[in-house]
């Protein structure tokens, strides 16, 4: 991976900032400032260009707007890795792809087990399937040499496939009623972006101009607007280390790590425990998410990756053992950012009263998975 040292350092900082932002949000949500916090996120913001006007609460500007930039960065990273990184060597694809798939199936099955008889609850089946790359790499980096670098690379590859799966899930299962006019405009802007690449336009400002137009069209189409970020990323030229893709990725990475993801965590992680009783923790949605992240992820990833390590001698040269694999499998249960995001999509048009359950399940499941994974890897070394 290019610039691997700076990448992992940045992800470490990002994981720490995410944790701080989430803790602050939880503290505020359980304090007298809770009303102000909720009011702040509900403030409407408007953007007008000519006759076109978009008005949304601040929370949705973050989730639909800023998160599109995050998905743009994800798309750029995936394209880079396919062209000349981890995913460019086809022999490196099978293990992380199958591991990520198993890490998706088991959490989904656990969620379905608890919510099969509740049609609305069941719409959140994908919530525990996600892995937060910033948090996971942040936790792993705190362990230093206890985790072989090759295992960190593998974790990154698994997270990339996890992101690809999340993109497909959002596109297929969390798309509203479609507007053919807006979709047609989105297709036109996509073709323009492809044309800019083909005719060797290398001005980021031109791509971003039509990228914003594409985002607006996708926003109005019924497809979730964040997917515009992925489409834009796939059209960005990539011709080597100093390419437009590399420059845009470098420029966005700091904004995403230091602003967008912490702001998303602050806006979405504010779960209030005021007035909660023990029965809330046995709610089917909470159990499905919490156990899906903690139990489902570790089962899926440990069984699949453990098989390759134990029986196919995968990573044998790096002396990776099953205890390290189990620790990594646990840490992959930190779904946080993407789990909260999918949760907001799953229930936003059905039952917003379920969002506190989503937050409780994601926070508890991610915390327990991350802590136990950290302890397993730390104690194994000792």
Curated annotation (Swiss-Prot):
Pfam families the UniProt entry points to: Na_H_antiport_1
Molecular function via GO: sodium:proton antiporter activity
Protein's GO biological process: regulation of pH
A GO cellular component entry from the record: plasma membrane
TM region(s), chain numbering: 13-33, 58-78, 94-114, 124-144, 153-173, 179-199, 204-224, 256-276, 285-305, 325-345, 357-377
Compartment list: Cell inner membrane
Entry-linked Gene3D superfamilies: Na+/H+ antiporter like domain
Sorted UniProt keywords: Antiport, Cell inner membrane, Cell membrane, Ion transport, Membrane, Sodium, Sodium transport, Transmembrane, Transmembrane helix, Transport
InterPro entries: Na/H_antiporter_dom_sf, NhaA
Membrane topology: Multi-pass membrane protein
Catalysis: reaction(s): Na(+)(in) + 2 H(+)(out) = Na(+)(out) + 2 H(+)(in)
UniProt record similarity statement: Belongs to the NhaA Na(+)/H(+) (TC 2.A.33) antiporter family.
HAMAP family registered for this protein in UniProt: NhaA
Task performed by this protein: Na(+)/H(+) antiporter that extrudes sodium in exchange for external protons.
Protein name: Na(+)/H(+) antiporter NhaA
Taxonomy of the source species: Bacteria, Pseudomonadati, Pseudomonadota, Gammaproteobacteria, Legionellales
Encoding gene, per UniProt annotation: nhaA
